[in-house]
Amino acid sequence: MLATDSDPIVAIATASGRGGIGVVRISLGRAGEAAALALSDALCGARLTPRHASYVPFLDGAGEPLDRGIALYFPAPHSYTGEHVLELQGHGGPIVLQLVLQRCLDAGRAYGLRLAEPGEFTRRAFLNDKLDLAQAEAVADLIEASTEAAARSAGRSLDGAFSRDIHALVDDVIALRMLVEATLDFPEEEIDFLEAADARGKLAHIRERLAHVLGDARQGALLREGLSVVLAGQPNVGKSSLLNALAGAELAIVTPIAGTTRDKVAQTIQVEGIPLHIIDTAGLRETEDEVEKIGIARTWGEIERADVVLHLLDARSGLGPDDEAIAARFPAGVPVVRVLNKTDLTEAPASVARVGSGAERADLCEVRLSAKRGDGIDLLRGELLRIAGWQAGAESVYLARERHLIALRAAQAHVARAAEHADQNAQALDLFAEELRLAQEQLNSITGEFSSDDLLGVIFSRFCIGK
């Protein structure tokens, strides 16, 4: 904990701009109850009753009202931060909020009151055991949620669903570690603690439960991050038309002139609550046009960063030599969907089929559709969800971040290595115990029982000021 973590802090807790209500929040840190009572007198002209809403004037230094609104006092530890907290809820104009904020700073100068840093209120909630780290991150995820599914999943994380699963896993690992340690510490007793307690069965249960939690976390990470989908192919195969069809709006210019799209056009759409970041790119071809060359170079950059590439072809001509040359340059680790567009000109029905061959593209899928008429668009959306690994109706999903997935995969690897050492050889048992300890350490890092100050700084710096 840093020395500044106990400073009294203040910030505007509502979004910038104009609104019906604006909130100024004060958390008093080491200044405590005496400062809370003194500030309520100075700011509101009255002692506030704990956990009661009082309609009061917000006073300037001369005792004149700056605004009128609701004032609340939450004594420690029953507050968001676990400290004594004052909230002033007035009108949401930027000028009046700044005046109230400055008045708070002036009135609290004697107590060392300062402006809060981004995420500092939630950081204090974490440090004071009001939230664990996964719940604290869920606060930011709930604020930033771009879909209903993401918001509901963030709410489940904030409610502690993710944390409860992690704590249950940690408890199981600790219980198994105790058996291993007992066997190592009391060899003279000749008691097979591991065999008596079915240690291998417990380890299998941990592995099964860990795989389940990791699966849910992957779903949650997909809700949070979405999928980057790049439309690639030769000019004039209908990439812009497909973007418009997927988005349900005219976002890109569509003309019969090859090379119309010179730079990327991006749009985020929702499919079953999953954000799909669709990127239309410049057509891939040999050209002497310098501007078009720049656009083509950017296209390949987008392809390198993509989660999925939609390789568009003209359904009338199919996969030609130039298309094969383009496909050969696609990164091996990026899933590709071959999209044969313009089926309205061939009268072929919309369809989806697996056409993969070879090790690199064994799961290659081919979708036939008409972006112009909308035929087959739902088939393509379904294929994108399949590639993403989304399981429809995943009601228990909680929002997760990349660091959570990394920690869960690392824990899974340590538990797998522990299973390799699950015999009665003393040296193997030492390794068994160490792998379990490392797995526990990874799981604890998710909820913050084991976290570096650097990690905490990065997480909370991404919050808004008033949180």
From Swiss-Prot:
It is found in: Cytoplasm. This is tRNA modification GTPase MnmE. One of its GO terms (molecular function) is GTPase activity. The lineage of its organism: Bacteria, Pseudomonadati, Pseudomonadota, Betaproteobacteria, Burkholderiales. It comes from Burkholderia thailandensis (strain ATCC 700388 / DSM 13276 / CCUG 48851 / CIP 106301 / E264). Homodimer. Heterotetramer of two MnmE and two MnmG subunits. Belongs to the TRAFAC class TrmE-Era-EngA-EngB-Septin-like GTPase superfamily. TrmE GTPase family. InterPro entries: G_TrmE (IPR031168), GTP-bd (IPR006073), GTP-bd_TrmE_N (IPR018948), GTPase_MnmE (IPR004520), MnmE_dom2 (IPR027368), MnmE_helical (IPR025867), P-loop_NTPase (IPR027417), Small_GTP-bd (IPR005225). (6S)-5-formyl-5,6,7,8-tetrahydrofolate binds at R25, E87, K130, K467. Pfam families: MMR_HSR1 (PF01926), MnmE_helical (PF12631), TrmE_N (PF10396). SUPFAM superfamilies: P-loop containing nucleoside triphosphate hydrolases. One of its GO terms (biological process) is tRNA wobble uridine modification. Coiled coil: none annotated. Mg(2+) binds at S240, T261. Residues 226-389 form the TrmE-type G domain. Gene3D superfamilies: P-loop containing nucleotide triphosphate hydrolases (3.40.50.300), Probable tRNA modification gtpase trme, domain 1 (3.30.1360.120), tRNA modification GTPase MnmE domain 2 (1.20.120.430).
